[in-house]
Amino acid sequence: AGRRVAVVVHLEAKTALLATVLADGGAHVVAAGSNPHSTRDEVAAALVDRGVEVHSTRDSGYDAWEKDLLAVADTEPEFIIDDGAELTIRMASQRPSMFEAVKGVTEQTTTGVARLMELANRGRLPFPVLAANNAACKHLFDNRYGTGQSTVQAILNLTNMLMAGKNVAILGYGWVGRGIAAHVRALGGTAWVVEVDPVKALEAFMDGHQVGNLEQALRRADFVLTATGGRRAIGRQHFRHLKTEAILANAGHHDLEIDVEALAVEAEAFQSVRTGIDEYLLPDGRTVFVLANGALVNIAGGLGHPIEIMDLSFAVQGVGCHELARGTVPDGVNVIDPRIDSEIARAKLASHNIFLSKKEEGQEDHIDDLLGPKG
């Protein structure tokens, strides 16, 4: 109670619940969107009505978004619930004195954890971070089942197309890529996985997906989905490999994975053919479609994850913030205590009226039987 907490996430109905839970617990909550395209204005207004300070409007542009993040920074939060480390990185670079006063951060995404690890490696992380993304109850479910379903669902809703029989290039086979590939296959599509990590590529192959280099996958792909967390996974040099009427969508962290600006320069003509779908006519007569202007398709072009997934992620974030407030987490990037992970999973199972058995006497492997009792 009384602590200042910044919540920088995709501001929509599920995330709003997290902010209100914290506020109801007595925290002074300030919220902003972690992406300029994902805020739901009606949700932001509802949060304001509940007494939460909000700095975010949908599709206001990057300049306004940057100002919103700095406005949150200027409230001098003690704790940050971050997505992509968007607020944390900006405070480190643009509000250094306020950054030094932060007492802890929980981070939601793979990209954000990587950014915070780099900050730590540079000796610029003076407080504890809980990598919520690395909790089993987050990445095994949110990244895989949540993003997998919501990405494919958004694409099919936007295009009104059939997935069965389609070839789908999936760039990246982390937990997000795994989830997308599984949902594509479940609907009758063929996943063509592109990876730079040979272990992940081999895993995709053993999972039964097609695996190849980027050029091979693009030549076949009806849909091209980026899930790398990096920049320009699809850039100018790749456009010539796209088949005509290929549909591009992004499921990575930001709208930087598909170089839409380069595509606009390359194209001879452009038109918005329907809500969330833009068509580019290339000089050789091929057409290429981009969904949600290259922003996160499941959020900018859909409703995001189901609540049955997000309750797990925000349980991790909320409990993580509580642990930080207790002052028991050491400086640096940390993983949440596995016992807390287990308790969250147990509570989730109980909500479905599922209760687990326990090992009975004689079922555990007793090392004393092999080595003798401790002497």
PLM regions and their residue ranges:
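Glycine-rich phosphate/diphosphate-binding loop of Rossmann-like nucleotide-binding domains
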Residues: V9-A27, D142, G146-A221, T226-T228
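Alpha-helix C-terminal capping/helix-to-coil transition sites in glycosyltransferase folds
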Residues: T75-E76, R219-R220, T244
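A short helix->loop->beta-strand "cap" motif at the edges of active sites that frequently abuts
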Residues: G26-A27, V52, S97-E100, L125-F127, ...
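Adenosine-phosphate binding glycine-rich loop
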Residues: G2-R4, E12, G33, F127-G165, ...
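ADP-ribose/adenylate-binding Rossmann-like module
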Residues: G33, F79-G84, R95-T111, G230, ...
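Glycine/serine-rich phosphate-binding loop and adjoining beta1-alpha1 elements at the start
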Residues: A1, A31-K166
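Structural alpha-helical scaffold elements that stabilize or flank donor/cofactor-binding regions
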Residues: V72-A73, Q216-A217, H241
